[in-house]
Amino acid sequence: MNFKYIVAVSFLIASAYARSEENDEQSLSQRDVLEEESLREIRGIGTKILGGVKTALKGALKELASTYANGKRTAEEHEVMKRLEVVMRDLDSLDYPEEASERETRDFNQEEIANLYTKKEKRLLGPVLGLVSNALGGLLKNIG
């Protein structure tokens, strides 16, 4: 009698444990799915924000470039224009990375390419913000 009781209790414990493991796996997979959906939403929002910022920045840079292009330029303004053109090319290369990498890889080896991309990442935001602030400052000086 004790043996049958022990077997029955062991069977109940094993089945309860199996059910709890199954429930844990289901809840983990549901959490994973929810986390993945959240990450996709966040990435989508981030991509939209970045796209909007890039579009606004490109528009502002084009406006500044046209402002500088229409009038007579000093040497300093000419240098600013050249920098704006470089920034515009960098922004365009972000939109079409395959074409940019093909152009850039024609004459470089792999180590130089890695250094080039690292430098491009470092030099993109600093000069863009500097140029925009300098250009806006110059425009405000000219207006005022």
Curated annotation (Swiss-Prot):
Keywords: Amidation, Amphibian defense peptide, Antibiotic, Antimicrobial, Cleavage on pair of basic residues, Cytolysis, Fungicide, Hemolysis, Secreted, Signal
Residues annotated as signal peptide: 1-18
Keyword Amino-acid biosynthesis among UniProt keywords: no
Protein's UniProt keywords contain Transport: no
An example Gene Ontology biological process: killing of cells of another organism
A GO cellular component entry from the record: extracellular region
Modified residues (Isoleucine amide): 143
Domain of life: Eukaryota
Tissue distribution of the protein: Expressed by the skin glands.
InterPro entries: Bombinin
Main location: secreted
Localization (cell): Secreted
Modified residues (Asparagine amide): 70
Proregion span(s): 19-43, 74-123
Function description: Maximin-1 shows antibacterial activity against both Gram-positive and Gram-negative bacteria. It also shows antimicrobial activity against the fungus C.albicans, but not against A.flavus nor P.uticale. It has little hemolytic activity. It possess a significant cytotoxicity against tumor cell lines. It does not possess a significant anti-HIV activity. It shows high spermicidal activity. Maximin-H12 shows antimicrobial activity against bacteria and against the fungus C.albicans. Shows strong hemolytic activity.
Family to which the UniProt record says this protein belongs: Belongs to the bombinin family.
Protein name (record): Maximins 1/H12
